[in-house]
Regions:
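Long, contiguous domain-sized segments
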Residues: 1-30, 195, 199-212, 218-227, ...
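Extended, highly charged clamp/arch subdomains and adjacent linkers
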Residues: 1-288, 373-381, 569-576
Length: 576
């Protein structure tokens, strides 16, 4: 149950979220979670609406419930009505001839709209102009990647190196050879996947794949006695491969290593994957870890598309850019890594920032040790005024390094609220540099709220079969709105058809809260929606969180291993 207060209204809304109750108290937690997952993944609009109506009939014997506090005191009372609130969303293609029935119109408390799917920018085949597409794969196949010119000018291509056990090398070599082949998706994936034309055709550059037994194919052992032994041997082989020149190193992880996912390093328990990433990032080496369970023919076209993108990006190339962002705006995401106490030392918090502009430049990641952090009851860290001021200065420097000028506007995203010290410190720092326009935004999931779209047309009213559209937004107050980054999108095979990626349950929106700034809701929503298409570690049509937040939090998990390099600036592609 959730209670939501509405600005300038004498009433609030009550949200009911169905949950499963297990009578068997001895049922294992993992089993309960799996049963719940399967149940809610199939609880779509109409079934959800029916479930709510069943509970309404149980809770409300009449039109409303009346309560007195204390009981019997009529002077202080409140009541709960069984009328659900509605939101009116007007898209650019809405039909003005459709009249909303009065019984629905009276229940409209919120209004909003729908942001179109953001377009991505690709150089045309003849490179005479830029073309635009909302589907990353189709855009690449029909055009060229942003950094095509590097290969046309220097003819350098993309080189791979491999670390794999000799016993598994034949199978792994067969799998990565698919990178050079034409592949077609299975029928059920036709709504968002296109044919894979081979690496050279997709990215307009040559891919050099080594063979087992060559100097660019190092053999690891199949069996180790500890995670530490794996890490030591892998890093040794990484150093050998790095001597042979720049390449993307593929590291095969066999199932025999499953039990060694963490290692003890200087008293800390560290994820093996993160340890390898941090080791390589500190040396400017890009890697791609591939687990043995990936080497199946199931969804092969999808896997090879994903792997090809990872390789292209980790060769420090840019595949696409956003078409809708202001080139004079700097975008930063804040993530944190908190170290538990080690050898009686205090917690250490590392802050990180992520800078973007529409051209794909300035993709920098810098570590900043946060001195004297302030923790809330949930152990979330916050910056003091002094640390926030330093953070603002760091943004200026990162942008200057990439663009040779200062931005006129700065937008900062993070998952937790901004304290007054953080607001004042960041704004004062940027203002001192002449930057007056500063947007401070908190982005978090709003799981309490479910929106069930109504089908309103000339034939009547009913619950829609499909979830809410991606890009829908609802204004809650002057500084708060909801944005659906996950939802229905057009099908790539026929854009008049609807496609719901994953097809699971009812999508939850993001709750956006503004602590500084004056941009319109449409501007902020368009920027956030665009950044959900900028995670270059995936060919998913989008991620639920914008890349400013999604990548910053992921990178923060690796960054604490590099805390001794807190003044160094990294290309973020070293971490993905």
């Amino acid at each position: 149950i959730g209670l939501n207060f509405i600005e300038d209204k004498e009433y609030a809304t009550l949200s009911l979220r169905p949950e499963l109750f297990f009578t068997d108290k001895d049922m294992p937690k993992e089993q309960r979670q799996e049963v719940s997952r399967q149940y809610f993944s199939k609880l779509w609009n109409k079934k959800y609406d029916e479930t709510l109506k069943e509970w309404e009939s149980i809770i409300f014997k009449s039109n409303h419930l009346k309560f007195c506090i204390p009981k019997g005191n009529e002077r202080f009372q409140f009541q709960i009505s069984n009328n659900s609130s509605l939101s009116l969303l007007l898209g650019k293609d809405h039909d003005p001839a459709i009249i909303i029935p009065q019984q629905l119109s009276n229940r409209i408390l919120f209004r909003g709209g729908i942001i179109p799917e953001p377009l991505l920018c690709f150089p045309s085949i003849n490179a005479e102009r830029d073309n635009f597409d909302w589907n990353q794969m189709r855009g690449l196949v029909r055009n060229k990647p942003t950094d095509y010119w590097k290969d046309e000018k220097f003819s350098i291509g993309v080189s791979l190196s491999v670390i794999a056990p000799i016993e598994k090398s034949g199978r792994f070599a067969s799998f990565i050879s698919n990178l050079s082949r034409n592949l077609s998706p299975v029928k059920k994936d036709h709504d968002y996947l296109v044919d894979y034309p081979g690496f050279n055709s997709a990215y307009h550059t040559q891919l050099f794949i080594p063979s087992p037994g060559t100097d660019k194919w190092q053999y690891s052992k199949l069996y180790y006695t500890s995670a530490y032994e794996i890490a030591s041997d892998i890093t040794l082989k990484i150093n050998r491969l790095a001597i042979n020149g720049q390449s993307v190193i593929l590291i095969f992880i066999p199932k025999e290593w499953e039990k060694f996912k963490t290692l003890n390093h200087k008293g800390e328990k560290i994820d093996l994957h993160n340890y390898i990433k941090a080791y390589c990032a500190s040396r400017g080496i890009t890697t791609q870890l591939i687990e043995e369970k990936t080497l199946t023919d199931i969804m092969l076209c999808e896997k090879i598309w994903w792997l090809s993108l990872a390789i292209y990006v980790k060769s420090l190339r840019t595949p696409w850019t956003l078409a809708s962002l202001d080139e004079n705006t700097a975008y930063a995401g804040i993530g944190y890594s908190i170290l538990s106490k080690v050898d009686n030392e205090q917690h250490v918090v590392m802050g990180c920032s992520h800078i973007y502009n529409r051209f794909g430049e300035g993709l920098k990641y810098k570590l900043q040790k946060v001195n004297n952090p302030i923790f809330d009851r949930k152990n979330n860290p916050y910056m003091s005024y002094e640390e926030a001021y330093k953070f603002g200065t760091m943004i200026q420097n990162l942008f200057l390094e990439s663009m040779d000028k200062l931005p006129t506007r700065v937008v900062i995203h993070k998952r937790t609220h901004f304290r007054n010290d953080e607001i004042n410190g960041i704004k004062d720092s940027l203002k001192a540099a002449g930057i007056e326009t500063v947007e401070l935004l908190t982005i978090e999931f709003e799981c309490e709220r479910k929106e069930l779209p109504y089908d309103i047309n000339r034939y009547g009213v009913g619950i829609h079969n499909y979830p809410i559209k991606r890009g829908a937004y609802i204004v809650i107050s002057d500084n708060t709105f909801l944005l659906w980054t996950h939802g229905v999108v057009p099908s790539i095979r026929n854009e008049s058809l609807s496609y719901y990626p994953g097809g699971i349950g009812i999508p939850a929106p993001l709750k956006i809260t503004r602590y500084s700034g004056s941009s319109t809701v449409q501007t902020i929503a368009t920027e956030i929606l665009g950044f959900t298409k900028m995670n270059w570690n995936s060919f998913n049509l989008y991620t639920k969180l914008p890349a400013t937040i999604d990548t910053s939090n992921t990178l923060a998990q690796v960054s604490h291993l590099l805390r001794h390099k807190s003044e160094q600036t990294f290309d973020y592609r070293l971490f993905i």
